[in-house]
A protein has these predicted regions:
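Glycine-rich phosphate-binding active-site loops on the catalytic face of alpha/beta enzymes
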Residues: 11, 86-96, 128-140, 171-204
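Alpha-helix-loop-beta-strand connector modules within alpha/beta enzyme cores
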Residues: 50-69, 95-112, 140-168, 201-204
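Catalytic domains of carbohydrate-active enzymes, especially glycoside hydrolases
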Residues: 25-40, 122
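Catalytic cores of alpha/beta
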Residues: 28, 67-82, 96, 111-124, ...
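N-terminal amphipathic alpha-helix/helix-capping segment at the start of soluble metabolic enzymes
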Residues: 1-24
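Glycine/Thr-rich beta-alpha phosphate-binding loop at enzyme active sites
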Residues: 78-88, 107-156, 191-199
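Hydrophobic faces of well-ordered beta-strands that scaffold small-molecule active sites
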Residues: 7-13, 37-39, 67-69, 84-86, ...
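N-terminal active-site wall of soluble small-molecule enzyme domains
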Residues: 36-99
Length: 204
């Protein structure tokens, strides 16, 4: 996985896809700040995810953004997406690799270096840690810190993705402490004060 320091945003989809979503996504991608886009839809059927995924994949391809699927290796394979993100309750990376081959596989490690070491043994391509702040998207069960990033950097040179309540007021400290990508969702899609494009433009 290549790391582009100027494209440090790992954008996660809203849970509900509104009509305005696709035009908002294009505007965001035009800023050239996004390296990854993860499709995360919990309450849609496989068929619905497939239809939505095909549209998003085209947009991602046009802007050279890697298209990842949350949790579902079979949807990843069907869409021929660039990769899949796996949680701790999902299939492990080695088993996922048997299904989707040499695609990008990222693994949630919460705040645990022990889980990170296991993910590395299972050949994960990147490690995701969090939550670093309170989140509008998920209830915070695990609290990560800057020290989590520092410890992770000592055991691997794989990219580190940080997640959890990241916004324009708190993102810089994470980058200064060598997080490679900022996973953002609620700040963009649930922001009551700004449109998605204005929110992304606050992150320089």
């Amino acid at each position: 996985m290549k790391i582009n320091k100027k494209k440090f945003i790992y954008l996660i989809s809203p849970l509900k896809i509104k009509k305005s979503f696709y035009s908002d996504l294009i505007k965001i991608f035009k800023t050239n700040k996004v390296s990854f886009f993860q499709l995360r839809l919990k309450k849609k059927s496989f068929k619905q995810k497939l239809i939505i995924g095909k549209k998003i994949k085209k947009i991602c391809k046009n802007f050279n953004v890697k298209f990842l699927i949350n949790d579902d290796v079979f949807l990843t394979k069907k869409l021929n997406a660039d990769g899949c993100h796996l949680g701790q309750k999902d299939m492990n990376a080695l088993d996922a690799r048997k299904i989707i081959g040499n695609k990008i596989i990222g693994v949630t490690c919460h705040n645990s270096i022990k889980l990170a070491k296991v993910a590395l043994l299972k050949k994960a391509d990147y490690l995701a840690f969090g939550a670093f702040n309170l989140s509008k998207t998920k209830k915070v069960k695990y609290k990560a810190s800057i020290n989590t990033i520092k410890k992770a950097k000592k055991i691997t040179d794989k990219p580190i993705v940080v997640i959890g309540g990241i916004n324009s007021n708190n993102y810089q400290n994470l980058l200064l402490n060598k997080a490679n990508f900022l996973a953002i969702s609620g700040y963009i899609w649930k922001n009551k004060k700004m449109k998605p494009i204005d929110a992304i433009n606050k992150i320089i």
